[in-house]
Amino acid sequence: MTEQQPVAVLGGGSFGTAVANLLAENGVPVRQWMRDPAQAEAMRVNRENPRYLKGIRLHDGVEPVNDLLATLQASELIFVALPSSALRSVLAPHAELLRGKGLVSLTKGIEAQSFKLMSQILEEIAPEARIGVLSGPNLAREIAEHALTATVVASEHEDLCQQVQAVLHGRTFRVYASADRFGVELGGALKNVYAIIAGMAVALGMGENTKSMLITRALAEMTRFAVSQGANPMTFLGLAGVGDLIVTCSSPKSRNYQVGYALGQGQSLEEAVNRLGEVAEGVNTLKVLKTKAQQVQVYMPLVAGLHAILFEGRTLNQVIEHLMRAEPKTDVDFISISGFN
């Protein structure tokens, strides 16, 4: 990658904009592509993304654009921050242009029809590209406001990890590397579901003990499912697992937490999502995750409980009561209980 070659960021949302700013602050020329030409022009003129990151100045090194073809042709390193529902339709027509390029997914979601993660879709579209993911406890606004933050870039291609570290690592943003792409990405996608439960618990005035129980049992569920799919359980003790889960389940800045909080205040799911005005991937993930967990026979009572709340008319109190009445099991999976016999 030559010094002046631009890095592409696909997506005009909050996280894509925050990452574009980080790149530009490190002296990297950035082309941020978005589907809406009016949004691109407004950001170019006003140097702000008022819908998704109001009050954050867009760095002069970020060029908002609407020409996807030109953006892909000009860049060898491409960060993909598109909604899970749109990623395939946006990039599949341009598959030939992606050959040999570095594609890094920023999207924490799962494709509904196939239960594929975003990097798996990228791999299908561009099998000869180098694929990676970026995930961790990364609230977009805090990144944009230069709060001290760490993240994980994961790929089977060590050179891609090093390339991402070189362009993103900075004074307030630390980038760690991992070879467990599947585990890192799955952690980022699964925790969105549990953030909805956490937001509901806070809105309903539940105690700190209850919230702590929900978060730790969520981690156990996430890990149990991920290991059944081939992920490394140790990945879930890092930034992309427990780190991301804690911040998403604890912060009112989290979109999925906000949806849960609105539900806890008595709003319908439709009202909560409409009020948010952005994609809350957890709602989409919940539907496909419940089905997949049943197919592979992985015990996920919180997922089943949240599905019952959102789509079957149950309340959070009923779900927690059911959880408390369930048969007690071991605290931490993957630790032998032979000593109990």
Swiss-Prot record:
Assigned keywords, A-Z: Cytoplasm, Lipid biosynthesis, Lipid metabolism, NAD, NADP, Nucleotide-binding, Oxidoreductase, Phospholipid biosynthesis, Phospholipid metabolism
Binding sites annotated in the UniProt record for sn-glycerol 3-phosphate: K108, G136, K191, D244, S254, R255, N256
Name of the top EC class for this enzyme: oxidoreductase
Principal localisation: cytoplasm
Domain of life per record: Bacteria
The enzyme's E.C. designation: 1.1.1.94
Pathway in which this enzyme or protein is active: Membrane lipid metabolism; glycerophospholipid metabolism
Residue stretches in coiled coil: none
GO cellular component: cytosol
Annotated Gene3D superfamilies: N-(1-d-carboxylethyl)-l-norvaline Dehydrogenase, domain 2, NAD(P)-binding Rossmann-like Domain
Active site per database record: K191 (proton acceptor)
Any Pfam family matching the protein: NAD_Gly3P_dh_C
GO biological process: carbohydrate metabolic process; glycerol-3-phosphate biosynthetic process; glycerol-3-phosphate catabolic process; glycerophospholipid biosynthetic process
GO MF annotations in UniProt: glycerol-3-phosphate dehydrogenase [NAD(P)+] activity; NAD binding
Catalytic activity: sn-glycerol 3-phosphate + NAD(+) = dihydroxyacetone phosphate + NADH + H(+); sn-glycerol 3-phosphate + NADP(+) = dihydroxyacetone phosphate + NADPH + H(+)
Key word Glycoprotein present: no
Cited InterPro entries: 6-PGluconate_DH-like_C_sf, 6PGD_dom2, G3P_DH_NAD-dep, G3P_DH_NAD-dep_C, G3P_DH_NAD-dep_N, NAD(P)-bd_dom_sf
Keyword hit for Signal: no
Cellular localisation: Cytoplasm
Ligand binding (NADPH): S14, F15, R35, K108, A140, R255, V279, E281
Function summary: Catalyzes the reduction of the glycolytic intermediate dihydroxyacetone phosphate (DHAP) to sn-glycerol 3-phosphate (G3P), the key precursor for phospholipid synthesis.
Alphabetical list of NCBIfam families matching this protein: PRK00094.1-2 (NF000940), PRK00094.1-4 (NF000942), PRK00094.2-4 (NF000946)
Family statement: Belongs to the NAD-dependent glycerol-3-phosphate dehydrogenase family.
Protein name, as recorded: Glycerol-3-phosphate dehydrogenase [NAD(P)+]
Organism classification: Bacteria, Pseudomonadati, Pseudomonadota, Gammaproteobacteria, Pseudomonadales
